[in-house]
Amino acid sequence: MRMRKKPNLIPRMDRCRDRMIPDPVELRGHWRDLMPQARELRVELGCGKGRFTAETAGLEPDVLFVAVERVPDAMIVAMERVVEKGLSNVFFVDGDAARLRDYFSPGEADRIYINFCDPWPSNKHARRRLTHENFLVLYRGVLRDGGQIHFKTDNRELFEYSLFQFPKAGYELSEVTRDLHGNGVCGIMTDYEEKFHDLGTPINRCVGTKLHLEQEPKFRPIAGPRDLAPQDGSKVLAEDR
């Protein structure tokens, strides 16, 4: 099942064009020029319809947020949410996680959010998981030392797999929970998260902090965006996030 096409997508995108970064490569190393007063630069991978993006940015107006999403029909909803709230600290990139090192220079990002990514359950597709060791090594190339990855998923198998991957890639784990909202709602939810929480599905969360290493783990170039595209029937659609 693919996401439903949004009507009037092009004119709607045009109305939000000041929130879109058409060529993120040109801003590599200069993102803070967009918001010189920003105390942090945070990147969200797969913002979906942007509820988490907009609400988090609204609570932290002194933080610069860059939301990366490759599904235009989802991204337009996120952009409209941001524009409706009058937020000036959020920008969007129509791009792919595999190209983060093209978009950001070493140490440029303070935090990365990964919320409810595709679990890619088949072992033969393990390298496509956004928490595979190789992706986590890729993120090291844009995070500062001490920078963090905040990861949430409803998929227990993906979560347990990820807990094994983070230390291998040079991150210290903290705030590990397998039932984030067990004692009441904790933090800002995505649309997808709220839906499954209401159904009684436990939400898993952890934080990985980038450690300084004398020798960086070897990064193996990742396949192009087309090879990383979600399969039909993927559990987590951009429409849901």
What do these predicted ranges mean?
Residues 45, 68:
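Conserved beta-strand/loop positions that form the S-adenosyl-L-methionine
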Residues 46-50:
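Class I SAM-dependent methyltransferase "Motif I" SAM/SAH-binding loop
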Residues 1-38, 173-241:
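SAM/dcSAM-binding transferase cores
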Residues 146-153:
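Conserved beta-strand signature within the Rossmann-like core of class I S-adenosyl-L-methionine
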